[in-house]
């Protein structure tokens, strides 16, 4: 069944900033998708153009992207009468109409909004759940529930504290199911609130943009100590491990790293990539850290390679790879990381997201599906992670509705699958392994 009508509008994301929402109509019904947006963005991401009119939303409006959908993309797709189950064909039409490598003509936010809505319509057309449709598009027969990586302490560009490193996460790998993982994660989160309140006072339990706590601490070791104490207090030392998203590109200055970058610049505080790697190795030795994302700048390839060679944990590329096949291929060739962070809006279409995932997996990498800091109530990535069988997802703390929307959808999916539900657990890095 082909598309009958497409209408896009400007809505607000979880940060109060404009983003694109798309309504798509077929004979089967009405399908809606909303596009997320990042705060710490990689310079190599597909372009998400803003209007630039300082009198509207401080220049961050997306009316041009909305207009591209309503006046160009929508009419072209309706005219072509392509069935909504043909995801790749529809995405290809939009990409070719845009004609640029980084989607700068229409914008990744315009193309992705339509692509997500098409995928939802395709599932309805086939009469299957969205996660099953995505699995079919990816050629997967299995369906796997992921380990959630809860971002429970926020720093970096996600919080107004002095903490340089952006996310400190807990992963309930020892849980028996996704429902159990949610319970464990929520209990650790509440335990952490108590630990922070007892040590720093009630105002230290304010939350950041992704629902994690944002105590005004500077030392990254201190954040890890808080997590270690909260996990122990909740009684889950044997079930919960720690992940980090350093987002080091945010504090890299001329090839060196400034761990107090929110204070006035002071070159004596800058350290080299090698010194930063030593700090990470200390974290791995002293704490149950099993995953570190973006430990170095997005173009500091030598530091990445050196670090991956010396550690056996998961090293995740986000700003390094930006869900882009060329960057993934180069990263694999350089042995620069061993896991892709998959963000649909970095590449700008469902088809290219699936291709990026499969490319990373073909190199033996893990894949972690991710939200963005500017989120909406859209739950697409919950179905995506199950259909792609990546085994891991990060979509914030168990706090703030735009984060819980995804986690709650995953619980519904697990319930719907019943005894066929498979939870990645300790195999989260390679969930298909027998």
Swiss-Prot record:
<feature type="modified residue" description="N-acetylserine">
    <location>
        <position position="2"/>
    </location>
</feature>
<comment type="pathway">
    <text>Carbohydrate degradation; glycolysis; pyruvate from D-glyceraldehyde 3-phosphate: step 4/5.</text>
</comment>
<feature type="binding site">
    <location>
        <position position="318"/>
    </location>
    <ligand>
        <name>substrate</name>
    </ligand>
</feature>
<keyword id="KW-0963">Cytoplasm</keyword>
<dbReference type="Pfam" id="PF00113">
    <property type="entry name" value="Enolase_C"/>
</dbReference>
<feature type="binding site">
    <location>
        <position position="318"/>
    </location>
    <ligand>
        <name>Mg(2+)</name>
    </ligand>
</feature>
<dbReference type="InterPro" id="IPR036849">
    <property type="entry name" value="Enolase-like_C_sf"/>
</dbReference>
<feature type="active site" description="Proton acceptor">
    <location>
        <position position="343"/>
    </location>
</feature>
<feature type="binding site">
    <location>
        <begin position="370"/>
        <end position="373"/>
    </location>
    <ligand>
        <name>substrate</name>
    </ligand>
</feature>
<dbReference type="Pfam" id="PF03952">
    <property type="entry name" value="Enolase_N"/>
</dbReference>
<keyword id="KW-0479">Metal-binding</keyword>
<comment type="similarity">
    <text>Belongs to the enolase family.</text>
</comment>
<comment type="subunit">
    <text>Homodimer. Interacts with PNKD.</text>
</comment>
<comment type="function">
    <text>Glycolytic enzyme that catalyzes the conversion of 2-phosphoglycerate to phosphoenolpyruvate.</text>
</comment>
<keyword id="KW-0007">Acetylation</keyword>
<dbReference type="InterPro" id="IPR020811">
    <property type="entry name" value="Enolase_N"/>
</dbReference>
<dbReference type="GO" id="GO:0004634">
    <property type="term" value="F:phosphopyruvate hydratase activity"/>
</dbReference>
<dbReference type="GO" id="GO:0005829">
    <property type="term" value="C:cytosol"/>
</dbReference>
<feature type="binding site">
    <location>
        <position position="158"/>
    </location>
    <ligand>
        <name>substrate</name>
    </ligand>
</feature>
<dbReference type="GO" id="GO:0000287">
    <property type="term" value="F:magnesium ion binding"/>
</dbReference>
<feature type="binding site">
    <location>
        <position position="167"/>
    </location>
    <ligand>
        <name>substrate</name>
    </ligand>
</feature>
<feature type="binding site">
    <location>
        <position position="394"/>
    </location>
    <ligand>
        <name>substrate</name>
    </ligand>
</feature>
<keyword id="KW-0456">Lyase</keyword>
<protein>
    <recommendedName>
        <fullName>Beta-enolase</fullName>
        <ecNumber>4.2.1.11</ecNumber>
    </recommendedName>
</protein>
<feature type="binding site">
    <location>
        <position position="245"/>
    </location>
    <ligand>
        <name>Mg(2+)</name>
    </ligand>
</feature>
<dbReference type="InterPro" id="IPR029017">
    <property type="entry name" value="Enolase-like_N"/>
</dbReference>
<dbReference type="InterPro" id="IPR020810">
    <property type="entry name" value="Enolase_C"/>
</dbReference>
<dbReference type="InterPro" id="IPR000941">
    <property type="entry name" value="Enolase"/>
</dbReference>
<keyword id="KW-0460">Magnesium</keyword>
<dbReference type="GO" id="GO:0000015">
    <property type="term" value="C:phosphopyruvate hydratase complex"/>
</dbReference>
<dbReference type="GO" id="GO:0006096">
    <property type="term" value="P:glycolytic process"/>
</dbReference>
<dbReference type="InterPro" id="IPR020809">
    <property type="entry name" value="Enolase_CS"/>
</dbReference>
<feature type="binding site">
    <location>
        <position position="293"/>
    </location>
    <ligand>
        <name>substrate</name>
    </ligand>
</feature>
<feature type="binding site">
    <location>
        <position position="293"/>
    </location>
    <ligand>
        <name>Mg(2+)</name>
    </ligand>
</feature>
<keyword id="KW-0324">Glycolysis</keyword>
<feature type="active site" description="Proton donor">
    <location>
        <position position="210"/>
    </location>
</feature>
């Amino acid at each position: 069944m082909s598309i009958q009508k497409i209408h896009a509008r400007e809505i607000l994301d979880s940060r109060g900033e404009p983003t694109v929402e798309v309504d798509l109509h077929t004979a089967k019904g009405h399908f809606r998708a909303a596009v997320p947006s990042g705060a710490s963005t990689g310079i190599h991401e597909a372009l998400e153009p803003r209007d630039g009119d300082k009198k509207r939303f401080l220049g961050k409006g997306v009316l041009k992207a909305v207009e591209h959908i309503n006046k160009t993309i929508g009419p072209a797709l309706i005219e072509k009468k392509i069935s909504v189950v043909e995801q790749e064909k529809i995405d290809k039409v939009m990409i070719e109409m845009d004609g640029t490598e980084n989607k700068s003509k229409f914008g990744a936010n315009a193309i992705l909004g339509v692509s997500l809505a098409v995928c939802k319509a395709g599932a309805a057309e086939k009469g299957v759940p969205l996660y099953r449709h995505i699995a079919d598009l990816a050629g997967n027969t299995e369906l796997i529930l992921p380990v959630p990586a809860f971002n429970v302490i926020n720093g970096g560009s996600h919080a107004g504290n002095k903490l340089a490193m952006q996310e400190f996460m807990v992963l309930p790998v020892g849980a028996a199911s996704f429902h159990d993982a949610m319970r464990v994660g929520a209990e650790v989160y509440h335990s952490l609130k108590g630990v922070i309140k007892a040590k720093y006072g009630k105002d230290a339990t304010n939350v950041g943009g992704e629902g994690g706590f944002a105590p005004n601490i500077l030392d990254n070791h201190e954040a890890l100590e808080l997590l270690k104490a909260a996990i122990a207090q909740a009684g889950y030392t044997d079930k919960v491990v720690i992940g980090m998203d350093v987002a080091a590109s945010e504090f890299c200055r001329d090839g060196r790293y400034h761990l107090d970058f929110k204070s006035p610049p002071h070159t004596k505080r800058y350290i080299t990539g090698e010194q930063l790697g030593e700090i990470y190795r200390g974290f791995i030795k002293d704490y149950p850290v099993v995953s570190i994302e973006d430990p170095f700048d997005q173009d500091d390839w030598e530091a990445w390679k050196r670090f991956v060679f010396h550690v056996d944990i998961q090293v995740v590329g986000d700003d390094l790879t930006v869900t882009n096949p060329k960057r993934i291929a180069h990263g694999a060739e350089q042995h620069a990381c061993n896991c892709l962070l998959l963000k649909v809006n970095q590449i700008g279409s469902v088809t290219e997201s699936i291709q990026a995932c499969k490319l990373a997996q073909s190199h033996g990498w893990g894949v972690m599906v991710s939200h963005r800091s500017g989120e909406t109530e859209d739950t697409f990535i919950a179905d995506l992670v199950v259909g792609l069988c990546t085994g891991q997802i990060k979509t914030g703390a168990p706090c703030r509705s735009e984060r819980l929307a995804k986690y709650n959808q995953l619980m519904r999916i697990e319930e719907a699958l019943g005894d066929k539900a498979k939870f990645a657990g300790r195999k989260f890095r390679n969930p298909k392994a027998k």
